[in-house]
């Protein structure tokens, strides 16, 4: 997917969360992207951030940076021994 499309989509998510309480905006954006974006889309937007992230609204940029800095932990490969 082209970066401009991802930027548009991410900013649309951000616009939705603008109506939430201020302390819920960035976490809400991050949670939505984490839950509903394919890992390839997330990796592409992370690379876009690394390249400057032009065009991303400030709360969207912050949410993506938070996601990038705190990667998901999958329990699929973790040891669950007793």
Predicted regions and their residues:
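Intrinsically disordered, low-complexity, basic-enriched segments
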Residues: 1-82
């Amino acid at each position: 997917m082209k970066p401009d499309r991802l930027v548009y989509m991410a900013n649309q998510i951000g616009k939705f969360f603008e109506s939430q309480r201020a302390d819920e905006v960035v976490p809400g954006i991050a949670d939505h992207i984490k839950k509903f974006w394919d890992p390839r889309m997330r990796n592409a937007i992370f690379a876009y951030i690394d390249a400057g992230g032009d065009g991303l609204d400030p709360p969207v940029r912050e949410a993506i940076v938070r996601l990038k800095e705190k990667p998901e932990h999958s329990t699929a490969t973790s040891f669950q021994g007793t």
